[in-house]
């Protein structure tokens, strides 16, 4: 199980926007969190939120199964990271 922690200082998202190579404007909401990958220290990462999704509240989370998908050639891939509160 992958453990994710959102600290109180990370309870908001930042918006990154611009124009794609195809000339279309885009906007992404990103939130910082720490992911425990089993090493000595957790790793600070950015997760992209779904459009209209509020920021995750501070707390402990795990990765929801909908974050994974099967790729074109049958390999397991990570899709957009979605979190659920840890029990």
Swiss-Prot record:
It holds the Pfam family Phage_DNA_bind. The record marks 41 as: Involved in DNA binding, and in the dimer-dimer interactions of the protein-ssDNA complex. Keywords: DNA replication, DNA-binding. The keyword Cell membrane does not apply. GO terms for molecular function: single-stranded DNA binding. The record marks 16, 21, 26, 34, 46 as: Involved in DNA binding. GO terms for biological process: DNA replication; rolling circle single-stranded viral DNA replication. Binds to DNA in a highly cooperative manner without pronounced sequence specificity. During synthesis of the single-stranded (progeny) viral DNA, prevents the conversion into the double-stranded replicative form. G5P is displaced by the capsid protein G8P during phage assembly on the inner bacterial membrane. Belongs to the inovirus G5P protein family. Homodimer. This is DNA-Binding protein G5P. It comes from Enterobacteria phage M13. The lineage of its organism: Viruses, Monodnaviria, Loebvirae, Hofneiviricota, Faserviricetes. The gene is V.
């Amino acid at each position: 199980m992958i453990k994710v922690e959102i600290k109180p200082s990370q309870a908001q998202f930042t918006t990154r926007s611009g124009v794609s190579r195809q000339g279309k404007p885009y906007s992404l909401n990103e939130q910082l969190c720490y992911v425990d990958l089993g090493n000595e220290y957790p790793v600070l990462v950015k997760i992209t939120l779904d459009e209209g999704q509020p920021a995750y509240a501070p707390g402990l989370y795990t990765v929801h199964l909908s974050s994974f998908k099967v790729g074109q050639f049958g390999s397991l891939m990570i899709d957009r990271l979605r979190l659920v509160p840890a029990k």
